[in-house]
Amino acid sequence: MGLLDDPRNLEILAEDNVRTLKIPNAKLTPPVAVILVGIPAAGKSYLVENLTRAFPLAVLSEEEMLKFLAPRISFFERAQEEIFALSLKTIEKLIQRGISCIFDYSVKKREDRALIKQRVEAYGGKFILIHLQVDKEEAYKKLSQLNNEVSRGERKGVIMNKDLFEYEVASTMLPSSAEPSLTFRSGDPESLRTVVDQISRITAR
């Protein structure tokens, strides 16, 4: 039986996952859930690092959740589905406890983002979506550099080839006009300051 086949199992795993997180002492009222969407090498980790310096946010990491789930995932093809299920339930539990969070992961599907928004707002939180903008060629150049670092053992990670990069780009559903979002432009310090200011205004309402 897989993680998604037993809701009780998911509840227990989400509680265990919350205990693995670094929870900030300070709190935003109401709590917020910051969700990201962008193609590979768009600067997600850089943005997460800077936003956690500016705001009290617990970080949900795709990489850490994959490690957490590794012994339990029923088969490889369900990995992404199970990571999303665990992340959604974990976000719910954090918001219920008044803990703000950021998901260090590109939530590619609009329906998944809509579901997170629905759950966050149902528990009294605020949903903030950030679109990470980057030129495709620039992103692939950066990705190639990261791949080289991984192959030389200078960085941990998985090498993403051109075909997989193109698949990720094609399958990423960017926010539509009906899906309000903030915009972060990779490599633009002023864009980072703007996003921080915008989140400050949202959390002050």
Q: What annotation goes with each model-predicted range?
A:
Residues 123-143:
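Conserved phosphate-donor/acceptor-positioning beta-strand/loop module used by diverse small-molecule
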Residues 149-196, 205:
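Small-molecule kinase domains that catalyze NTP-dependent phosphoryl transfer to phosphate-bearing small molecules
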Residues 23-30:
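Phosphate-binding P-loop
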Residues 39:
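P-loop (Walker A) phosphate-binding loop of NTP-binding proteins
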Residues 36:
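Hydrophobic anchor at the beta1->P-loop junction of P-loop NTPases
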Residues 42, 46-99:
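Conserved substrate/cofactor phosphate-moiety recognition/catalytic segment
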Residues 2-23:
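N-terminal pre-Walker A segment at the start of P-loop NTPase domains
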Residues 79-127:
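Glycine-rich phosphate-binding loop used to anchor ATP phosphates in small-molecule kinases
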